[in-house]
């Protein structure tokens, strides 16, 4: 272990990618998962095209620079958590490693993350890129949910650390509810929810548009996003919240000021009901999506009920939040209250059906919030990749050359701290 450079930890998400080195508390770089490429008409003979293709392959920008590059088209290699375009992904990783981390890939082991239910073929593609293109000495592909569970140890004592729990991971593009038992994902019980950060932003945008508050149209999306991140919170009861705003508007309405990028004139927006209505779509999804009406608390409860009976109590006891869209004030408290309500109602019904003969043992529902929540997946990866065990479970370049990319289909669970 001595003299070895720290592992690189890269978590590529739908909206943002988190890059950094193992052992650090926070990622060194958080960049949008966007890439700007030149799209030219494919004309001319093959030789000319081959020459220009080599040049084109180097002519691209990623992250914030991608949005500033004029004359380029912006692409997103990841959609809803899954890699959609592997050529773009390879180019994206190339700049992540060389331009941002400024690392020599031959000298560092790598930990990459994958979404739940990622296909084994995708792991093979990842292995091919890392071993063939970057020539890395070792690679480990970790499931995001397991890393998020490990990150929650930051707020717990050593004897409470467990890799059994249910992860509510809500980012920009997708929300997953993932049950994990002893570090292994219970794949058949995972649920995906079509509501995440991007949907909240669009919903706030539409609420502001209805009021016609004088936001420049080309800035309406970024204004909605800024309002979401700065002013939104989760309320315990919508009706009471509306009443609060109506009786004391001065106390609750906030002011957001921005500058028109074209005319440079300042504009102001009064932010009222949007503050609590935006994130409320987690608990009342029908507000923004009439096709989907099941609240998040009910989905978490259903997922746990679908799991094997012997892990249900530990799952209720360790509901871990992860991702930027769980950062709203009082999100954890509201989720815990709603789940506790449905659990207690169920226990009461079973007691009534048995006419009092069966007294069910109360179920302890605990939603864990902690200070590393926003970058939980990256932080969990950073923690695990800084342990000596990490280097024992990594797939090495030698094994890859002997057996091929199929070795990366399985990545052993480690770090259960037993």
Swiss-Prot record:
The keyword Cytoplasm applies. InterPro entries: Actin, Actin/actin-like_CS, ATPase_NBD. One of its GO terms (cellular component) is Arp2/3 protein complex. SMART domains: ACTIN. GO terms for molecular function: actin binding; ATP binding; structural constituent of cytoskeleton. It is found in: Cytoplasm, Cytoskeleton. Keywords: Actin-binding, ATP-binding, Cytoplasm, Cytoskeleton, Nucleotide-binding. GO terms for biological process: actin cytoskeleton organization; Arp2/3 complex-mediated actin nucleation; axonal fasciculation; chaeta development; intracellular protein transport; lamellipodium assembly; myoblast fusion; nuclear envelope budding. Gene3D superfamilies: 3.30.420.40, Actin, Chain A, domain 4 (3.90.640.10). Functions as ATP-binding component of the Arp2/3 complex which is involved in regulation of actin polymerization and together with an activating nucleation-promoting factor (NPF) mediates the formation of branched actin networks. Seems to contact the pointed end of the daughter actin filament. Required during embryogenesis for the developmental migration of tail hemocytes anteriorly, along the ventral midline. Belongs to the actin family. ARP3 subfamily. Component of the Arp2/3 complex. This is Actin-related protein 3. It comes from Drosophila melanogaster (Fruit fly). The lineage of its organism: Eukaryota, Metazoa, Ecdysozoa, Arthropoda, Hexapoda. The gene is Arp3.
């Amino acid at each position: 272990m001595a003299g070895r450079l720290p592992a690189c930890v890269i978590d590529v998400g739908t909206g943002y990618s988190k890059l950094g080195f193992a052992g650090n508390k926070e990622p060194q770089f958080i960049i949008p998962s966007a890439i700007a490429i030149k799209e030219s008409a494919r004309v001319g003979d093959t030789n000319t095209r081959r020459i220009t293709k080599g040049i084109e392959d180097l002519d691209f920008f990623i992250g914030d620079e991608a949005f500033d590059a004029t004359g380029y088209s912006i692409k997103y290699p990841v959609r809803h958590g899954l890699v959609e375009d592997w050529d773009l992904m390879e180019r994206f990783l190339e700049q992540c490693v060389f331009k941002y981390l400024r690392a020599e890939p031959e000298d560092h082991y790598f930990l990459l993350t994958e979404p739940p239910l990622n296909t084994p073929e995708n792991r093979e593609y990842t292995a091919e890129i890392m071993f063939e293109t970057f020539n890395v000495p070792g690679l480990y592909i970790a499931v995001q949910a397991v890393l998020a569970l490990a990150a929650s140890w930051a707020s717990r004592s050593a004897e409470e650390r467990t890799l059994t729990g249910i992860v509510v991971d809500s980012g920009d593009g997708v929300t997953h509810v993932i049950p994990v038992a002893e570090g292994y994902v219970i794949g058949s019980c995972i649920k995906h929810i079509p509501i995440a950060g991007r949907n909240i932003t669009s919903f706030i945008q539409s609420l502001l548009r209805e009021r016609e508050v004088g936001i420049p149209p080309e800035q309406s999306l970024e204004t909605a996003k800024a309002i979401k991140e700065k002013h939104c919170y989760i309320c315990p009861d919508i009706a009471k919240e509306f009443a609060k705003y109506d009786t004391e508007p001065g106390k609750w309405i906030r002011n957001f000021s921005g500058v028109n990028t074209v005319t440079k004139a300042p504009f102001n927006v009064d932010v009222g009901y949007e503050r609590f209505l935006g994130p409320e779509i987690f608990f009342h999804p029908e507000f923004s999506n009439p096709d989907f009406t099941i609240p998040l608390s009910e989905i978490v409860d259903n997922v746990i009920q679908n799991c094997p009976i012997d892990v249900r109590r530990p799952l209720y006891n360790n509901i871990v939040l992860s991702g930027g869209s769980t950062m709203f004030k009082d999100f954890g408290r509201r989720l815990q209250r709603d789940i506790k309500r449905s659990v207690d109602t169920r226990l009461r019904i079973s007691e009534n059906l048995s006419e009092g003969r069966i007294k069910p043992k109360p179920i302890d529902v605990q939603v864990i919030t902690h200070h590393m929540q926003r970058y939980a997946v990256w932080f969990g990866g950073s923690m695990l990749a800084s342990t000596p065990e990490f280097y024992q479970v990594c797939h090495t370049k030698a094994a890859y050359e002997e057996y091929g990319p199929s070795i990366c289909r399985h990545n052993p669970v480690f770090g259960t701290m037993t």
